[in-house]
Amino acid sequence: MRSPHITISLVFLFFLFLIIQTHQRTIDQTHQIGSNVQHVSDMAVTSPEGKRRERFRVRRPMTTWLKGKMIGANEHGVPSGPNPISNR
């Protein structure tokens, strides 16, 4: 019969090995994915269609968007004064 210390040590080393292997695979996959993404983004930036689209893109300023939201909020007719029902 083996000593419990040896068994526990072997189990611990086995789990440590699994953790290291999993971590190493994750790092390898991350580097692989990162290099692929950079390659795709370089192609997208250098494409002539992308440059044309970016030139004519019009962005609305945030204040216009907020004004539109405020106008939409006033349309539903909520009175701004005191509640006449609660004053009876």
Curated annotation (Swiss-Prot):
Species this chain originates from: Arabidopsis thaliana (Mouse-ear cress)
GO cellular component, one term: apoplast
Positions glycosylated per UniProt: 82
GO BP, sorted A to Z: axillary shoot meristem initiation; cell division; cell-cell signaling involved in cell fate commitment; phloem or xylem histogenesis; secondary shoot formation; xylem development
Residue ranges of the region described as Disordered: 69-88
Residues where Hydroxyproline is found: 79, 82
GO molecular function, one term: receptor serine/threonine kinase binding
Classification via InterPro entries: CLE41/42/44
The name this protein goes by in its record: CLAVATA3/ESR (CLE)-related protein 42
The entry's keywords: Developmental protein, Differentiation, Glycoprotein, Hydroxylation, Secreted, Signal
Signal peptide (residue range): 1-24
Family: Belongs to the CLV3/ESR signal peptide family.
